[in-house]
Amino acid sequence: AMTGQGGWPLTILMTPDCRPFFSGTYFPPRARYGRPGLEELLTAAAGQWKVKKEKLLDQAGQIEKYLKSQEWTERQAEPELGAVHQAFRQLADCFDSKNGGFGSAPKFPAPHNLIFLMEYGAREKRPEALAMAEKTLVQMYRGGIFDHIGGGFSRYSTDGQWLVPHFEKMLYDNSLLVMAYIKAYGSTGRKMYGCVAEKILEYVRRELTDSQGGFYCGQDADSDGVEGKYYVFTREEIREVLGEKAGRDFCRQYGITGHGNFEGRSIPNLLENDNYEEICEEPWGNGDHGGNICHGSCDTIGGRENEECRRLYQYRIDRARLHKDDKILVSWNSWMICACAMAGAVLGEEQYVDMAVRADAFIKSHLVKEGRLMVRYRDGDAAGEGKLDDYACYSLALLELYRVTFRVDYLKRAAAWAEIMTEQFFDRERGGFYLYAKDGEQLIVRTKETYDGAMPSGNSVAAQVLYRLLRITGDVTWQKVLEKQLCYLAGAMDGYPSGHSYGLLTMMDVLYPAKELVCTLSSGSDTERRRKLAAQLANLAVTAEGLTVVIKTEENAREMERLIPYTKDYPVPDTGELFYLCVGHECMQPVPQLEQLIEKL
């Protein structure tokens, strides 16, 4: 609004009554490389305030007037498939067919764009959409943006081929990337994608998980004041750690050369190695728990390259430690809860669902005060009034836990938080959710954000929450808010729908035929059979496009009928189970075996 460009971190100078008159991005402490420093900026601003105070106050008034005027330029539109198709074309136009990703350097993973492409490809029978997502996922894994020694992805690549990253690792990136790789695995069955997801999750469990179950924000790029020092190696270091022959083989596998690929050192990568898929599917030797897809850890199963990774992992820890940002944020933790829950369901790994359950318990215990969400927790202190992203993402996380566990308490809590979100943040006149609550801190304007940038916007996530609650409960209260929200999003994305790819996921959910599957399960069913059936249904709920799954049993019948009134029409059988499937407006006769419906699902 002030300079025509943006960036991070944000620097704002304000009047004493909190009206901005100057903005910028990063300023070093002192001037360098021709760039003014913060000390010089503040000194100059103080001088201007003394001699030109009225001019600065007038400037602040003009900025305030402009910001307030933007609220009245909002327009609404009807959700339609034209925007969905346009978003695909926009992404296709800037797709890098050689290296994957979109546009030129720097390249960001933008996992929600990839999830959109996979969903679009499945619904529209457009294999080229899936191919774009797959190419990107493969090349990102092969590149240096993925940590081949310790797992996890860095924030972005400074080049076009994903080789040299900005080495900072963030929780939200890795959460969304797990979701993208799990989506790819569910769509294709290609084992590699499941392995990458597991390696990200093992990194998060090992490096970013608090002893009480919450997830930390991330790790810095620098160690000893040097960016990337922790992650790069010389050829001599590799040989010293692994021995001459093993070191030589490892260097050949992972592109470690004498001249290096980053300031004289080498970032391990598989960009020149055609055996990347086979290497990806091998288990690690980093003490990881491992999983069904990658067969457990190297402590129990061999794997020469990964034993070498274990030794290099320990070597670099001993060589230089990274600073860890150990704040625990509700919104970012919620994304990792979603990722863990989805991975657990699709990979058949209960340990990942357990990670999600523990993180939820942490939020419930430490980040709720007087019935409202806080923003962050650190060292025993919870602070900050929850914003839209906190309520929307946490509601979605609880709905994801319901989707994979079918525990009614998750659904109940999701609905309760979504009610607060709607009451405190929703603009009932024009649609859209404000960033700040109506009873929270009041700034000069109440803003709304819709652009799905590094993370999906709170407005896009809120739309998905409303949609899922509507599909599960059938409550028309959610429908009214959802309809207004989608009209608001449709207006906001006009002309640039590809910048709202997560919002488009909900739009597709609404515009394409939906599927509902109700399973009624007798109490006499064998316990192990019930467990396996629930796992199968959870997998379907995550992987099948447009499918909502509900399980009703004698144990949860009363609560289900209160939260989901239409389940009163689905009696629990005396023995076995019955499955009721509706596709669009067509409902089929109940069948006693899920296998009878698999093709339609």
What are these regions (language model features)?
Residues 1-339, 343-346, 486-601:
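Replace the tail clause
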Residues 206-209, 368-392, 399-561:
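Long, polar/charge-rich, low-hydrophobicity segments
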Residues 153, 174-177, 181, 340, ...:
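Extended, hydrophobic alpha-helical segments in both membrane/secreted and soluble proteins
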Residues 139-146, 358-366:
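Glycine-rich, acidic and aromatic/proline-enriched surface loops and short helix-turn segments
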Residues 314, 318, 342, 346, ...:
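Conserved helix-loop functional segments at active or binding sites
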